[in-house]
């Protein structure tokens, strides 16, 4: 069930130091692990917090095997409820994910024509861009949401009779036409191309990230008109003005590969993550700290900490930063974010 992680998940350094005074409090994720995996608290307490002395991230070690990790993020908590809640709040109340003034600042200071994100599609800025492209109408949002859910469900025909299949097919056509007409009627202007890069990580939500039997990535692809692509060398040809990674860089066992992919393909990368200076919650194998920004800079990944520049009230310790492999890009944006 557990395995040792004796090197840093990000930089692969073996210079990791146990932090004896750091403990993580239980949360609803942890309570679910203990219950569903039938782990006693004594065994669970063997998980200790380590810090990488090279890049500054924190790690839980030992931690779950990759097989158990996949079970956690596909079965025990297969639904990314925070992500889906962001969508539901937007549809019902036109409330955006709380990123302070980030969207307005980025749009003002970066000419964005091609934009991409990694994995969780409702954690970042896709909802903001969608709202910019269409008439700001709650009735439109609710209408298209209902028709999307009905459309996806009408295509789920396993175990149905031939008559039900025939009727469902007719309904599917109606729902699909409703979606098309609603978008066409309410569209103001398509001003950018949007991409979502996905992978099959065992440390993040994917195959079972569903709401009302609809997968988040499928829903997002239709709602936002996304180009949905896999992380692979073939897709390095795509270039972006901005790449967003929102609470997902600590949900992959290959964070450096993901970050480098984003940096190599985009002028700017914006990252939103936990800032776990005082411990690390046990649903994470690793997490970032502000020390990580110094490591990036020393490795010519230039960055600016914008945590205090986006007018956000924080309930927890979090970190926002912009980065680029082009120093001129960061120097330019740093002057604009003062």
Predicted regions and their residues:
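S-adenosyl-L-methionine-dependent methyltransferase catalytic module, highlighting the catalytic core
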Residues: 2-5, 54, 245-247, 252-338
């Amino acid at each position: 069930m557990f395995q040792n992680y004796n090197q840093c998940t990000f930089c692969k350094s073996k210079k990791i130091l146990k932090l004896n005074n750091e403990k993580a409090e239980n949360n609803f994720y942890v309570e679910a692990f203990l219950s569903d995996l039938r782990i006693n608290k004594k065994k669970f307490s063997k998980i200790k917090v380590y810090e990488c002395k090279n890049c500054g991230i924190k790690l839980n070690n030992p931690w779950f095997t990759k097989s158990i990790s996949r079970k956690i993020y596909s079965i025990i908590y297969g639904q990314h409820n925070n992500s889906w809640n962001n969508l539901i709040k937007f549809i019902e109340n036109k409330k955006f994910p709380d990123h302070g003034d980030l969207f307005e600042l980025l749009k003002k200071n970066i000419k964005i024509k091609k934009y991409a994100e990694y994995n969780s599609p409702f954690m970042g800025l896709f909802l903001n861009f969608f709202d910019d492209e269409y008439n700001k109408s709650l009735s439109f949002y609710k209408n298209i949401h209902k028709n999307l859910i009905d459309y996806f469900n009408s295509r789920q025909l396993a175990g149905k009779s031939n008559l039900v299949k025939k009727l469902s097919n007719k309904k599917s056509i109606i729902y699909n036409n409703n979606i098309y007409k609603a978008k066409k009627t309410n569209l103001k202007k398509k001003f950018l191309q949007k991409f979502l890069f996905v992978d099959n990580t065992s440390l993040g939500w994917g195959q079972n990230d569903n709401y009302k039997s609809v997968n988040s990535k499928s829903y997002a692809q239709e709602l936002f008109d996304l180009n949905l692509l896999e992380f692979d060398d073939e897709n390095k040809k795509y270039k972006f003005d901005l790449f967003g990674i929102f609470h997902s860089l600590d949900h992959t066992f290959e964070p450096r590969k993901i970050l480098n992919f984003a940096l190599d393909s985009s002028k700017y990368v914006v990252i939103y993550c936990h800032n776990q200076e005082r411990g690390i919650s046990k649903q994470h194998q690793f997490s970032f700290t502000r020390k990580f920004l110094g490591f990036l800079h020393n490795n010519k990944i230039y960055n600016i900490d914008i945590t205090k520049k986006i007018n956000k009230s924080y309930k927890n310790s979090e970190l926002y930063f912009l980065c680029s492999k082009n120093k001129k890009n960061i120097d330019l944006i740093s002057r604009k974010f003062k």
